[in-house]
Amino acid sequence: MICKKKFLSPIINLFHSIIINCKGMYITLRYMFKPKVTLNYPLEKGPLSTRFRGEHALRKYKNGEERCIACKLCEAICPAQAITIEAQERDDGSRRTVRYDIDMTKCIYCGFCQEACPVDAIVEGPNFEYATETREELMYNKSKLLHNGQVWEEAIDFRIKKNSQFY
């Protein structure tokens, strides 16, 4: 006598595998007609948050004068101790920076330096593409930071105005 379970088992397995394959094809077809989620990165870039923290920059006033007043609050508040500032007093009694260095290999992009600055001199801009070939290129000096400020001034100014309630 042939056991019914042994006879029906391959038939049940066949129907079960057909159902599983149909479910998989249904899911695949459903996603084929939805808009793509993946971006082709170098050619397409997704939107950044207005509070995104990217490459650092030093800003200038519209008349060309540097904003940094050498108060050294950013250097004091930096938890990674990545900022080094040397100041010099001017003839009119005000102070300005002679040396402003940021070691980007130490920086943790916390944004404390930006929050501590009373004149919005140091900011973290919208640039996230700054890969380098050597570590020395990640040691930003004052001229590199001022250059970043000039390049990204419009975007930085827009972000600060848009997020003024958060600063």
From Swiss-Prot:
Q: What is its EC number?
A: 7.1.1.-
Question: Self-association or partners: how does it assemble?
Answer: NDH-1 is composed of 14 different subunits. Subunits NuoA, H, J, K, L, M, N constitute the membrane sector of the complex.
Q: Where does [4Fe-4S] cluster 1 bind?
A: 68, 71, 74, 117
Identify the SUPFAM superfamilies for this entry.
4Fe-4S ferredoxins (SSF54862)
Task: Name its GO BP terms in alphabetical order.
Answer: aerobic respiration
Q: Where is the 4Fe-4S ferredoxin-type domain?
A: 59-88, 98-127
Annotated membrane topology is: Peripheral membrane protein
* Alphabetical UniProt keywords: 4Fe-4S, Cell inner membrane, Cell membrane, Iron, Iron-sulfur, Membrane, Metal-binding, NAD, Quinone, Repeat, Translocase, Ubiquinone
Naturally occurring in which organism (per UniProt): Ehrlichia canis (strain Jake)
UniProt GO cellular component terms: plasma membrane
Q: Which Pfam families match?
A: Fer4_7
Which residues are noted in the entry as [4Fe-4S] cluster 2-binding? Answer: 78, 107, 110, 113
Protein name per the record:
NADH-quinone oxidoreductase subunit I
